Amino acid sequence: MAKYLVIVESPAKVKTVKKFLGSNYEVAASNGHVRDLPKSQMGIDIENDFEPKYITIRGKGELLAGLRKAAKKADKVYLATDPDREGEAISWHLSKALNLDEKKMRRITFNEITKGAVKESIKHARDIDMNLVDEQQARRVLDRMVGYKISPLLWQKIKRGLSAGRVQSVALRIIGDREDEINAFIPEEYWTLDAVFKIPGEKKPLTAKFYGKEKEKMHIASKEELDRILKELDGVSYQVKDVKKGERTRKAPLPFTTSTLQQEAAKTLNFSTQKTMRLAQQLYEGVDIKGNGTVGLISYLRTDSTRISEEADTLARNFIQEQYGEQYAAKGEEKKAEKKNVQDAHEAIRPTDVTRLPALIKESLSRDQFRLYQLIWKRFVASRMKPAVYETTSVKIAGGEYIFTVSASKLIFDGFMSVYTQEDEEKTQNNLLVKGLDEHTELKLQDFDSQQHFTQPPAHYTEASLVKTLEELGIGRPSTYAPTITTIIARRYVAKEQKNLYMTELGEVVNNMMKKAFPSIVDVNFTATMEDLLDKVGDGTVDWKVVVRNFYPDLDEAVKAAEKDLEEVKLEDEVTDVICENCGRNMVIKYGPHGRFLACPGFPECRNTKPYLEKIGVPCPKCGKEVVLKKTKKGRKYYGCEDNPDCDFMSWQKPLKEKCPQCGGYMVEKGNKKVCADEHCGYVAMKKEEE
């Protein structure tokens, strides 16, 4: 009979952990949380100092009965849930649900599921950390209060099925603010000027970029300014004024945190944050490897630390020396990143065994598991390697009073780049390294190459860039990035198209209402400050009840004011003059996942539907028919011709009736300005108030 009971979170871990412990140990799984707040009510006793009313999660009764039985037989119960605040809370809930005797109950954690880590955790068994439990309780209670107080208001004022959240609503606002920036952006013209020179003794010409004057970098804002510069350069001689040679290094990247793994997997593997976390969980919990059984392949996946244990660091450097040569292994330099809100409770994400090369286990992994493991392995190995070294040359070329410059670089030692290069890895420029050039060398001008450009608006957020922004602003924590993004997409507040995130019409309505009624809830600084407070609960310096007590009155007051003052936003059925061709009824406007559409009110007898074409009172610039507001399949708004597909007119900005006085083309609305749709024209005017 087993003397000891070890309870882990997932059944997948049972198999991995069991093989490291002898027959004296029974390993069982809780299948995640066993107690939670009830779904049917807020579940917080406001009058009793915000005491949570926990209940057993439906369907967990039989599992808990089995665990109770096993716990009674065991001499000692080890609670081995995940090594974070969520895992700490699950252990605490288990202790309550199983009525565990404190004398025979111990908490163990391991950052990786390996034999050494599991056995070591038992040697260092401890009590449950109630500070971490209280932090999780505070987060759960705050999230529940926001959700249960505000969501019904959204149902009442907009439509049923909507939700608000302490972190998700801020993320939605961040996306909305970026869309406002993009919509209000006015492109500005600028020009670049390159000079192409013949180098003495070289067949390949040299291209240099216009810099300006010796002590003044110049920006060429117009064709007129370009023509003036070209006129002043007419007939001048060109001479090399300065040649500087040197070296520069490119440092190895730090090993992955949760955030940087999500960002890099999104950029290089095209994985959503949710997919990355699901695969990383599988790699952490254990995968069946041929000849080795179930093996945990990576360390714990929810971390904001770039720290690596001394043992793992030494093993990695030894591996690098053996496989790549001593010159590639870094010499123990400290690799630290100054980042906001780093808890440093865990190591960075790394392989559990650096000698387990991706190629050796490829056959045992799914394609996506392999790709993610390979990314983590390469990044970790690279982080323990020396920087890449480039030989550089910078040249200044004088022509009259103007300066042209050229910079070149050549990789002379690949360092960490022998293992790992990022998507945006800089490319070697002018690989000639500008040979044969010395100061005072006379150069012959072959040609000028001038190009017109326009400044670009800020980019739409992607999952990767949103995670980066949330982390930089201190919004959310490693465990919340993926579920936050998943929720706002699932709620149809945000649409994802070709990696970009766009606010839907529904998202705009919800975001505007949240900003108006609950400005502090969606305020970035307020939310970041709250996150810091919650972290302090976790380290024992702030009482969680104090945080909740201070938060609730303002929330309650704002909800009451919104119930009274906020107007309803009608997204319900609206009768139109469009006749259903099947039954003759007037069709109504319905609101679906992708926005509005026309439906027959005779449903279910008549199931006729068609796209809703909202006319904006502007003739199509191409064919003269009506321009209508449309939606992409994902819910992003655009303007197109009602005669599509026969007419392919399309604009992301709202077209205006007024013609451009400068070129005669059509104008579009951008914030409070009227802008010519032809960026080469560049006409901009302020809208009048009556417009």
Residues of each region from the PLM?
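Intrinsically disordered, low-complexity regulatory segments
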Residues: 1-140, 212, 425
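Alpha-helical scaffold elements adjacent to nucleotide-binding pockets in ATP/GTP-utilizing enzyme cores
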Residues: 16-20, 66, 89-97, 117-121, ...
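Metal- or metallocofactor-binding catalytic centers and their adjacent structured scaffolds
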Residues: 215-254, 441
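C-terminal or mid-to-C-terminal helical accessory/interaction module adjacent to the motor/catalytic core
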Residues: 113-195, 245-246
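Conserved short loop/turn motifs at secondary-structure junctions
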Residues: 82-83, 159-163, 245-254, 264-272, ...
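Basic, low-complexity terminal or inter-domain segments flanking catalytic cores
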Residues: 2-5, 16, 25, 151, ...
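Core structural elements
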Residues: 139-149, 167, 197-199, 248-260, ...
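Short helix-coil junctions and helix-kink-helix linkers
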Residues: 260-273, 467-477
